[in-house]
Amino acid sequence: MSSPGAESAGKSLQYRVDHLLSAVESELQAGSEKGDPTERELRVGLEDSELWLRFKELTNEMIVTKNGRRMFPVLKVNVSGLDPNAMYSFLLDFVAADNHRWKYVNGEWVPGGKPEPQAPSCVYIHPDSPNFGAHWMKAPVSFSKVKLTNKLNGGGQIMLNSLHKYEPRIHIVRVGGAQRMITSHCFPETQFIAVTAYQNEEITALKIKYNPFAKAFLDAKERSDHKDMMEEPGDSQQSGYSQWGWLIPGTSTLCPPATPHPQFGGPLSLPSTHGCERYPALRNHRPSPYPSPYAHRNNSPTYSDNPSACLSMLQSHDSWPSLGTPAHTSMLPMSHSAGPPTGSSQYPSLWSVSNGTITPGAQPAGMSNGLGAQFFRGSSAHGAPLGHAVPAPSASGSPLYEGAPTATDVPDSQYDASAQARLIASWTPVSPPSM
């Protein structure tokens, strides 16, 4: 005789089991309408066959890596004609489609020799296996998790030889009974060549277009192309700007090169306000101190091939009367021959240059005073003076030069003295225009 407590527990258990059995029955019913207990009408069809055909026309390629790479297009099949109440397992393997090793030459795949020995046969078992026939028929069977590798590392991955053509095969095995039955299906449009990197750009474009997980690859490619476009103008400007680097003030936000340019004795030392660390990634491979975004600066000066015109582009400074002409100069060597001023500057040329020496020229009384002390300054303790003497100012010269004191000293730490190596001797004499 059972106790009332046992009867209550039995009713509670029966209640819980009922809803579980109901869920199982619903699962068994799904897909049963496509079932056939005799299995005489078993059919397996390829999903996305039109997409597979587009890839086949171009000779499809699949990436193989050491850690394994998933396939695209994803292999999916729809199944009908299974016994809804029988148990089945779905398996996938790959067989060689021909007896060639392939190579990509002049935009097409051609046979390239004898194939390598086939790796041990690897079989991928669908993770839903085993399951009822009704389960397999209710929705397309997707092999989205299979990974292709070129290393024998196990883990359910399929090992393939690179540059060999393969064809996937799907096997359906009936399990759970006394008799094992198996049926195999393959689709020629799913053939592909295993590669470690895509060879055909059209295949790459199709993969990016139809694979939602390839959008990151597309974005990375666009960023890379944009970076290349940004670097190209920077590289082309390098040759034109590097020789005028001494015209840039010390407060510039441009970076010195990691390795000095061969024609300079060494990089210029810039003040602590320098913004070099803003572009740390450019220091290891750029010989020019100008990073690629330099072309987008709105306040960038306009450079001219005429050195005389460049001399006149510097801002005026109120300390001109206190400056004199040193016995040597820290101006870097030039690779261009200078001609007469072109008149592109708002100031006339203030210097008369001849045979490697710098001579102050005449300046009108109403002219703005001098050049900033941060330009043309070097350390007299380390620089090698030029062999030419600096002539005295002419009688008609500006009174600003008469009795001018010695040039203002600038700390050695601000500039590297090795940059004041020499001055080219091909300057053309320039006379200031009459006012």
From Swiss-Prot:
Q: Where is the composition biased (Polar residues)?
A: 297-310
* Compartments where found: Nucleus
Q: Say if the entry is tagged with keyword Nucleus.
A: yes
Chief place where the protein resides: nucleus
**According to its record, what are the GO cellular component terms?**
chromatin; nucleus
PROSITE patterns, per database record: TBOX_1, TBOX_2, TBOX_3
DNA-binding region, residues: 51-219
| Pfam families on file | T-box
Region annotation (Disordered) ranges: 280-310, 384-412
Q: Which domain of life is it from?
A: Eukaryota
Q: Name one GO molecular function term.
A: DNA-binding transcription factor activity, RNA polymerase II-specific
Entries under SMART domains matching the protein: TBOX (SM00425)
Q: Which PANTHER family match?
A: T-BOX PROTEIN-RELATED (PTHR11267), T-BOX TRANSCRIPTION FACTOR T (PTHR11267:SF83)
State its role: Involved in the transcriptional regulation of genes required for mesoderm formation and differentiation. Binds to a palindromic site (called T site) and activates gene transcription when bound to such a site.
Q: How does it assemble?
A: Monomer. Binds DNA as a monomer.
Name of this protein: T-box transcription factor T
Traced from the root, the source organism's taxonomic lineage reads: Eukaryota, Metazoa, Chordata, Craniata, Vertebrata
